[in-house]
Amino acid sequence: MNCDNRIPIIMCIDVEPDGFFIDRIKPLPWNGYEGAHRYFSELRKRIEETTGSPAHYTWCYRLDPQVAETYGSAEWPITHYSKFTEDFIKNGDEMALHPHAYRWIEKKQNWVEDLGNQEWVNHCLEMGFDAYRRLFNRTCESFRFGAYWISTETINCAERLGAAFDLTVEPYFKMKKRFFAAELYSAPLPDYDHVPREPYRPSRADFTRPDVTRKDGIWVIPVSTGKIKYQFGRLETLKKRIFSPDEIKPRTVTLNLSRGMNGFRSVMEELLGSLEKPYLVCVLRSDVCGEALSNPTDPVNMRQNVDYILNHPLVKQFVFSTPREAMSTMGYLNGTLAAGVS
């Protein structure tokens, strides 16, 4: 057992355009990414002064066919904002991949998240890993697939391409309804209900199951999640029992920095108190830091949740880490902590 009492925090910022099913002719700006660069660059000094440790973020880039077709090259987010990337690398941040499976369908005159087409999904991965290698002259270690989605075949493909850490899986998460029309997706979400909440090496036959016999290969580092049962007044509870019973059931809450404070704090405290080796994986879309917001409370929540983290009683134990640094701190990479047993 590793006696290190440091608590790693992996801060994943998904670097994306300011939209989803974007216009190929009139490309959306990446104002959110520009805002994220400003915000997290300024935040870094505060984190380091508060925790007493260097702060390293994980920037997860869209280097995929939608970006290539819309902006002229899969490498565009890196080459267009090269000074940002240089700054991140200088400060020890992780450059990771965040591919989506958007495919342009002429008949629909729209993009489709073609998650049900494994050949296309593999193509998206290969494009991203190839672009990454050209840009950085090394293999990408860390990735998290888009649209809350991953599959066994996709993790196996990423491993073949050289990935060491996957940060996609959100334990307990089951989305019953997509944010956009169902016909814009070619596959349902996987069932994350029984996925471990601590890092594990996945079975090559079923990514949701740990394979404790594996001694090498990719690690799944689950995003931090928990279940929250929201409380309502007696009359409101009665109404919900009749008209919307799902609303009084426990809900899965992800440590997304843009989430409302109550759910974020409850899950954070539960994780810190229950995991054998506590760690946090927080996520955020870059567009939350921009101007074209679908929910104007998102940046307010982000700042309040960051304040909560940095005013926490355990803050001196927090270390904002890359995936590899976090796994080393927790003892997984040197074999002092068993994997996939929670």
Give the ranges of each region predicted by the language model.
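Active-site beta->alpha N-cap acidic-glycine motif
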Residues: 1-87, 91, 309
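Hydrophobic faces of well-ordered beta-strands that scaffold small-molecule active sites
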Residues: 9-13, 57-59, 95-98, 141-143, ...
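Short catalytic/ligand-binding loop motif for oxyanion handling, primarily in non-cytosolic enzymes
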Residues: 18-21, 66-70, 103-107, 149-154, ...
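Well-ordered, non-membrane alpha-helical segments in soluble/globular domains
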Residues: 29-44, 74-82, 121-126, 257-269, ...
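A structural motif corresponding to the C-terminal end of an alpha-helix
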Residues: 39-55, 83-94, 131-139, 207-218, ...
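Metal-dependent polysaccharide deacetylase catalytic core of the NodB/CE4 family, i.e.
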Residues: 55-57, 62-149, 227, 285-287
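Active-site-adjacent pocket scaffolds in enzyme catalytic domains
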Residues: 145-276
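C-terminal domain-boundary segment and adjacent tail
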Residues: 242-342
